[in-house]
Design a protein with these regions (language model features):
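Terminal leader/tail segments of proteins
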Residues: 1-126
Length: 126
């Protein structure tokens, strides 16, 4: 497995130009537990530098949408998502979800957002 760092946008463009779909897996850093996996396309989109996964592609058994929120002046208010491992260990803010979005950002509504690359508590693999 390869950890992607640097210009994921450039790498995604090159891979897609060759006709091979790019698959992205997001993992919790400490345990390497998978949090989400999908191929770029209808189930996975890159938006403003972050990955947004369709809810069907995330590991709902280890992800908990919280009441904690953040309000982006452009996109609207999102809820933070925590990782809860099988041992009960909780890692805060591994992802976020916008239940409703401001006009112009509908593509991310209801999707789970993760930072691209390796940042904070998650890491990206392809």
């Amino acid at each position: 497995m390869t950890l992607i760092s640097g210009s994921i946008r450039e790498r995604s463009r090159i891979v897609q130009e060759k006709g091979t779909p790019i698959s992205v897996t997001i993992r919790e850093k400490e345990s390497s537990a998978p949090l989400a996996q999908a191929d770029v396309g209808p189930s996975l989109t890159r938006y403003e530098g972050n990955w947004y996964f369709d809810p069907a592609t995330v590991k709902a058994d280890v992800l908990r949408v919280t009441e904690r929120t953040y309000t982006c002046p452009q996109k609207g208010t999102c809820n933070w998502v925590d990782y809860v491992g099988p041992d009960g260990r909780t890692v805060k803010d591994v992802a976020w979800v916008y239940p409703q979005v401001n006009p112009g950002h509908e593509v991310i509504q209801g999707r789970y957002g993760f930072y691209a690359g390796s940042k904070g508590t998650t890491k990206e693999e392809n």
